[in-house]
Amino acid sequence: MWAWALLPICLTVWATGGIWIVYAMSVSNGSVNLSDGFPYISVSGTYPPQSCVFGQVLNVGAMLAVWISVIRFQQIRDYNCHSVLNSVSLATGILCALGTSIVGNFQQSNQLQTHLAGAFLAFIIGNVYFWMQTALTYMVKPKHGGCYIGPIRFCLSIACTALIVAMAVFLKMNMKSVSAICEWIVAMILFLLYGLFAVDFWHLDGHFFHVKKRRTVIPNEMEVSTVTLSI
């Protein structure tokens, strides 16, 4: 059903719009002073009232991300691709969503170490997730999106990786504003990568979740009679 394509689009629109609204709130109420430099995403969402909105935006986004990851996992299985990579990809997708929720609920001003752990899961593991999805895009058949979706995912994943490295380097050089800009771009790329699943989900007609019982091995009559005689 084509309506499934709306799910990743909703995540992209919700998350992108949500964090920019949080940024606007933090600037308008003076929680963030732009004369001190461009803020990190988490700095914008540290103080109330925008911290409440920030947490809600990321919690809903995390829920949608888990939903998308599970559907994508099953879709790939339905294409008879039973690669271990698909299972590992599901696990990393769920970890990415968990990290996103942690970032929203543990502000850096209150629980810095927990917040940083969540950021690692959201950004680093999230990037790994989309590298795996890029590989799976080339492995499965049919290939939705023609010959374009694979290269697009590949280029966006490269850009995401490069910007994460740049973010760490600029932070080490104490160029926090530039590092923060890199973080914002990484977040936008990750949201866009989630949105690209709309191309795959458009073709979800005929895909079903199956719950199968384990087959019970029943001995044949010869085996039963042999056992009986031996007794």
UniProtKB/Swiss-Prot annotation:
Ranges in the topological domain labelled Extracellular: 23-50, 105-115, 172-183
Domain of life: Eukaryota
Keyword NAD part of the UniProt annotation: no
Upper classification of the organism: Eukaryota, Metazoa, Chordata, Craniata, Vertebrata
Glycosylated residue positions: N29, N33
Species: Xenopus laevis
A GO term from the CC aspect: plasma membrane
PANTHER family: FASTING-INDUCIBLE INTEGRAL MEMBRANE PROTEIN TM6P1-RELATED, MODULATOR OF MACROAUTOPHAGY TMEM150B
Membrane topology, record value: Multi-pass membrane protein
A biological-process GO annotation: autophagy
Function: Modulator of macroautophagy that causes accumulation of autophagosomes under basal conditions and enhances autophagic flux. Represses cell death and promotes long-term clonogenic survival of cells grown in the absence of glucose in a macroautophagy-independent manner. May have some role in extracellular matrix engulfment or growth factor receptor recycling, both of which can modulate cell survival.
Protein name: Modulator of macroautophagy TMEM150B-B
Subcellular location: Cell membrane; Endosome membrane; Cytoplasmic vesicle, Autophagosome membrane
Transmembrane segments: 2-22, 51-71, 84-104, 116-136, 151-171, 184-204
Keywords, comma-separated and alphabetical: Autophagy, Cell membrane, Cytoplasmic vesicle, Endosome, Glycoprotein, Membrane, Transmembrane, Transmembrane helix
Alphabetized InterPro entries for the sequence: DRAM/TMEM150_Autophagy_Mod (IPR050911), Frag1/DRAM/Sfk1 (IPR019402)
Cytoplasmic compartment segments: 1, 72-83, 137-150, 205-231
Keyword field contains Transmembrane: yes
Stretches of the chain forming a coiled coil according to its record: none
Family under the similarity heading: Belongs to the DRAM/TMEM150 family.
UniProt-listed Pfam families: Frag1
